[in-house]
Amino acid sequence: MSDTLLIRNVRPAGGTATDVLIRDGRIAAIGAGATGGDASFDAGGRLMIPGLVEAHTHLDKSFWGMGWHKHTAGPALIDKIETERRNRREFGIDANRQSGRLVAQMVKLGTTHIRSHVDVDTDLG
């Protein structure tokens, strides 16, 4: 993997097209004078935005990649907990598999940081 990447003809935050040099995963220079790069490519005037952040998710409860299931939990917190436990058993939800599926999709769509909550309970062992 290259330590530096020169992205030519890109529009940071929708502004005027320019060049951006990335070094060690961070922006090192912006402007037509940005040079160098172990690798480079022309972005064709595309938009450059910061990576997306998912600040609150429950990766272990994802149905991503599975069929559609109606949400049947009641309004109380205990209703939601019991429904989630029942769904886990009934639909054979594997937290590792489902978490991986959802993370892969998030990264594909531009997410660079994820903060997740997970269950630790007697049903999981």
What residues fall within each predicted segment?
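N-terminal metal-binding scaffold of metallo-dependent hydrolase/deaminase domains
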Residues: 1-36, 47
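Hydrophobic "anchor" residues on beta-strands that sit immediately upstream
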Residues: 4, 50-52, 115
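Short, well-ordered secondary-structure micro-motifs within conserved domains or adaptor modules
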Residues: 38-43
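Short hydrophobic "helix-edge" motifs at membrane interfaces and signal-peptide entry regions
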Residues: 45-47, 99-100
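Di-metal (Zn2+ and/or Mg2+/Mn2+) metal-binding site signature of metallo-dependent hydrolases
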Residues: 46-68
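Single, functionally critical "micro-switch" positions that shape active/binding sites
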Residues: 53-57, 84, 109
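Active-site gating loops and adjacent loop-to-helix segments of metal-dependent hydrolytic enzymes
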Residues: 62-95
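Active-site loop-helix segments enriched in His/Asp/Glu that coordinate
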Residues: 86-125
